[in-house]
């Protein structure tokens, strides 16, 4: 038995280790909330939690701060009052009591140095170490990336620039900040690594600096950034000719390298790559769960398995979600809290590219396709309509997919033609095999016989699966279960429904797009960073809020938050 297997923690040991980190994150979150004047229920508002975590990630980003300080030195020559250390965070605050509760948007000022000081007091002084802040903030960045994937299909533009737009289902983690990308590599889709590799190949051709730098590789060696990217691609790629192609890229010429990467990406739509899936919740949700579970909290500190679904449900009972005026499609439309709850659920579990009919079979309420949703960007808007606790819950659970969906032997540009599984549940293949074959047939002929041989073998794998698509199943033998079926006694068979693709175009629904002209940009307040300044207007109606329904579920939590006066 390998040392790695011998040292593997038991589930109880793993939950205790998780709880240690999660509790430290919660305490740091509470302290920063208090620093910017948030108390009680306000700490449990989702949009506040997202804003605070974004501020933390930016304050811990050394390169961002270096650029900002450079701009500050230039700005100070023109404005002696400029403060490079000051940042503004846009938040939702509560006013009134009983049935006369209102919520309004404000911008609270604090400083980077103060946030860093708070983090050091809870996490230790070495914030630059991956084990101290890297993993914590990496998971925070992963949630933010999942959110953007659902709202904007963030990976589609990158996929279109670097190949075919259909490849966006391979771009999990496309929005993760560069600093955390390699820390979170095993949670990132192969399409993101392929896009990075193409960028490095282009940079080498154009003579850009940094493409030949020495970086750490696996097994303690060093090499170029391209070698590091190709190691990650080789590890994720489906076993067989795709991995052999990945090993050829570093030494191949420009055209061959790009073509090999295209083949790996396009074939990966069907020959599914490996990716590690975990549940990741914002810290405000972990705080909400801790307030409910109290002494039992440690037993629910899980990122996978049945308890991950349970702790998500528990957190959803206490958090508040804001409804603002203005959606992605219509500036005058009011956001739907039910739709935002669905987006939150899908972001926490990374479900943007999972079989949508499977996700729908696991939750308590009907779900919507993306183009039917009334949502904004999850930032704090100017006009708060309501703040409510969502009703959406999981009723079933399944193991997370940590293995290859298939074993090794086995013009619709921009539309979704494939799924990327999150849950290990037996299902038929949903990929449009014909479209994958069309993409692969674009590969040009080469005199390089070994590459041609590998391309031929990839096509053969695709053809075999295409001919036997109706008989082949992914995750053979795996099932989902009722949430109370802890021992997996009654497996539930799944049959894919009519809508396997979340981003499927719905011809029966054609929303009217209404976007108001942008207001003139007001003179920038030099004491507020760009972090939360987007959309802020000095003459706006910030603070002019409508009456809200009180959060009955949250009303009794204030006195339970540590350090609350």
From Swiss-Prot:
Compartmental location: Virion; Host nucleus
PTM notes: Late in virus-infected cells, may be cleaved from a 56-kDa protein to a 53-kDa protein by a cellular caspase. This cleavage might be a marker for the onset of apoptosis in infected cells or have a specific function in virus host interaction.
Pfam families: Flu_NP (PF00506)
Transferase is among the record's keywords: no
Molecular function via GO: RNA binding; structural molecule activity
GO cellular component, one term: helical viral capsid
Biological processes per GO annotation: symbiont entry into host cell; viral penetration into host nucleus
Keyword Aminoacyl-tRNA synthetase part of the UniProt annotation: no
Swiss-Prot/TrEMBL keywords: Capsid protein, Helical capsid protein, Host nucleus, Host-virus interaction, Ribonucleoprotein, RNA-binding, Viral nucleoprotein, Viral penetration into host nucleus, Virion, Virus entry into host cell
Family membership: Belongs to the influenza viruses nucleoprotein family.
Subunit-level organization: Homomultimerizes to form the nucleocapsid. May bind host exportin-1/XPO1. Binds to viral genomic RNA. Protein-RNA contacts are mediated by a combination of electrostatic interactions between positively charged residues and the phosphate backbone and planar interactions between aromatic side chains and bases.
Function according to Swiss-Prot or TrEMBL: Encapsidates the negative strand viral RNA, protecting it from nucleases. The encapsidated genomic RNA is termed the ribonucleoprotein (RNP) and serves as template for transcription and replication. The RNP needs to be localized in the host nucleus to start an infectious cycle, but is too large to diffuse through the nuclear pore complex. NP comprises at least 2 nuclear localization signals that are responsible for the active RNP import into the nucleus through cellular importin alpha/beta pathway.
Protein name: Nucleoprotein
Protein's gene: NP
């Amino acid at each position: 038995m390998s040392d790695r297997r011998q040292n593997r923690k038991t589930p109880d040991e793993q939950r205790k280790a998780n709880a240690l980190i999660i509790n430290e994150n919660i305490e740091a979150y509470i302290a920063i909330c208090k620093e910017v004047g948030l108390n009680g229920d306000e700490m449990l508002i989702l949009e506040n939690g997202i804003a605070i975590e974004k501020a933390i990630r930016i304050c811990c980003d050394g390169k961002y701060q270096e650029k900002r300080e450079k701009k500050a030195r230039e700005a100070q020559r023109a404005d002696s009052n400029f403060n490079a250390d000051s940042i503004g965070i846009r938040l939702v605050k509560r006013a009134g009591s009983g049935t006369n509760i209102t919520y309004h948007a404000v911008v609270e000022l604090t400083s980077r140095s103060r946030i860093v000081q708070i983090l050091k007091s809870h996490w230790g002084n070495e914030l630059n170490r991956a084990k101290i802040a890297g993993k914590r903030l990496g998971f925070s960045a992963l949630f933010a990336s999942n959110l953007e994937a659902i709202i904007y299909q963030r990976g589609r533009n990158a996929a279109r620039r670097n190949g075919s737009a259909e490849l966006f289902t391979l771009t999990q983690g496309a929005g993760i900040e560069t600093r955390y990308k390699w820390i979170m590599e095993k949670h990132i889709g192969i399409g993101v690594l392929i896009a990075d590799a193409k960028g490095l190949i282009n940079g080498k051709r154009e003579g850009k600096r940094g493409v030949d730098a020495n970086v750490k590789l696996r097994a303690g060696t060093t090499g170029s950034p391209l070698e590091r990217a190709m190691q990650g691609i080789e590890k994720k790629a489906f076993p067989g000719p795709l991995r052999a192609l990945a090993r050829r890229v570093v030494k191949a010429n420009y055209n061959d390298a790009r073509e090999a990467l295209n083949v790996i990406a396009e074939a990966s739509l069907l020959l599914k790559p490996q990716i590690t899936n975990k549940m990741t919740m914002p810290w405000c949700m972990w705080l909400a769960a801790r307030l409910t579970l109290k002494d039992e909290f440690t037993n629910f500190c899980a990122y996978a398995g049945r308890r991950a679904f349970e702790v998500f449900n528990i957190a959803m009972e206490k958090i508040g979600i804001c409804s603002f005026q203005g959606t992605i499609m219509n500036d005058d439309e009011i956001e739907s809290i039910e739709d935002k709850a669905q987006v939150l659920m899908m972001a926490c579990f990374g479900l943007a590219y999972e079989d949508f009919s499977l996700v729908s079979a696991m939750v308590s309420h009907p779900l919507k396709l993306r183009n039917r949703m009334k949502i904004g960007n999850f930032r704090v808007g100017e006009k708060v309509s309501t703040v409510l606790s969502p009703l959406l819950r999981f009723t079933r659970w399944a193991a997370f997919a940590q293995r290859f969906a298939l074993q090794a032997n086995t013009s619709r540009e921009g539309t979704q033609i494939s799924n990327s599984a999150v849950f290990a549940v037996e299902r038929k293949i949903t990929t449009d095999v014909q479209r994958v074959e069309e993409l692969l047939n674009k590969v040009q002929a080469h005199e390089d016989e070994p590459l041609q041989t590998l391309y031929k073998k990839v096509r053969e794998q695709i053809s075999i699966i295409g001919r036997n698509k109706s008989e082949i199943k992914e995750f053979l033998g795996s099932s989902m279960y009722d949430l109370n079926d802890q021992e997996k006694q009654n497996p539930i068979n799944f049959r894919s429904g009519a809508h396997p693709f979340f981003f499927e175009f719905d011809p029966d629904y054609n929303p009217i797009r209404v976007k108001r002209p942008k207001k003139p940009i007001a003179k920038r307040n030099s004491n507020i960073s760009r972090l939360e300044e987007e959309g802020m207007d000095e003459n706006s109606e910030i603070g002019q809020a409508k009456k809200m329904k009180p959060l009955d579920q949250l009303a009794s939590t204030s006195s339970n938050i540590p350090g609350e006066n």
